[in-house]
Amino acid sequence: MPNRAAAHASGSGKQSGAYKEIVEWIKALVIAVVLVFLIRQFLFSPFIVDGPSMQPNFETGERLIVNKIIYAIREPKFGEVVVFDVPEQDRKFIKRVIGVPGDTIRLEGDDLYINEKKIDEPYIKEAIEAAHAKGELYNLAGPDSNFPNSSNQEMTVPEGAIFALGDNRRNSSDSRVIGFVTDDEVVGRADIIFWPLNKLEFIKHWTK
């Protein structure tokens, strides 16, 4: 009888230990899920590039990490790559900040003017030079290629908004078409390319 009692007690102890371990695993998984949710909701989130509008700097299929907290601390700046919601199309766009509140924007062909000062754009310099070498404009002529245009004639960026352009000026639906992007629509700044692995890098944000 004592031996049976001891064996029974030992078995109960093992079951109790296994139960406690399962509970701990469940707790850890729940905490992990909650942390992932909070991080994605408030701090960082993934984004997949879809389309040619940011070529030559970003390609379709590249996966980025978007910093969602930075613009809660400060306002967007010229040259930063941002992801924002486009409610009318129920999707997100990735573009580059060109104008901030108070800036007057003018785009004529490949010449960008901010507050009537011509601005160099190093992030597309080589692409512009390659087009010019072939006797072409990088920003093809068209009804909505320049700014202002018939779709959007207001040149000065209002408070609580930004003016954003795609790097691929020939093929980009951006503020020339959809107008200014409000602060509420901005998701965050694209900070890291994490896929494919051979392109893993921090994204460079240019300044004037």
What are these regions (language model features)?
Residues 27-42:
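Hydrophobic membrane-insertion alpha-helices, especially the h-region
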